[in-house]
């Protein structure tokens, strides 16, 4: 896999607050190789941005290569600070996404998920054609509630026809269930890992602040740019 230049610089990461970790009492000792220093006054760890830049560059190379071969991506970030950035990133890169709640078994029980997606598509079609409104009022109200729930939880994967090739996780702790499902199925993962995370669980960890919106946005923007470049390469050379 060839290495490319992704315009990743330390100053930009510092402005985005990528270098702010969790309180020192919350740290995971496995993160020691990724930590630059401890700020005593604030009691927090500072991730080593040189290593962050290196791993982010490797992640960009990986997703570019995968996208250039037509692979499918799933971006997962369900906490409020990540949800908006996840949607924008996924739409821009034409990726699947989950930004509300991870339903247990979404990947490991793919048959059930696929059945739910069929139900979701059928209800949407019923609504678009107006057939839904011809039903009794009680049934209409119940089906509309079901449609709203399916839209919230499955709207980002409504066009997913099979398991993703790579999953990008914004917060390892928050998305632990999704991460375990990926590990079970052998799906490669790219994880933003803060100083309280376990880097061994991710196939490609990116040490970074996973709580600040600017930090999340910067990391996702770099990955999305690489995916878009890879997709363009795939279109030119199918």
UniProtKB/Swiss-Prot annotation:
GO molecular function, one term: structural constituent of ribosome
PROSITE patterns: RIBOSOMAL_S2_1, RIBOSOMAL_S2_2
UniProt subcellular location: Plastid, Chloroplast
Keywords, comma-separated and alphabetical: Chloroplast, Plastid, Ribonucleoprotein, Ribosomal protein
Any one annotated GO CC term: mitochondrial small ribosomal subunit
Principal localisation: plastid
Entry annotated with the keyword 4Fe-4S: no
InterPro entries on file: Ribosomal_uS2, Ribosomal_uS2_bac/mit/plastid, Ribosomal_uS2_CS, Ribosomal_uS2_flav_dom_sf
GO BP term, example: translation
Source superkingdom: Eukaryota
Listed SUPFAM superfamilies: Ribosomal protein S2
Coiled coil (UniProt feature): none
Family stated for the protein in its record: Belongs to the universal ribosomal protein uS2 family.
Protein name: Small ribosomal subunit protein uS2c
Lineage: Eukaryota, Viridiplantae, Streptophyta, Embryophyta, Tracheophyta
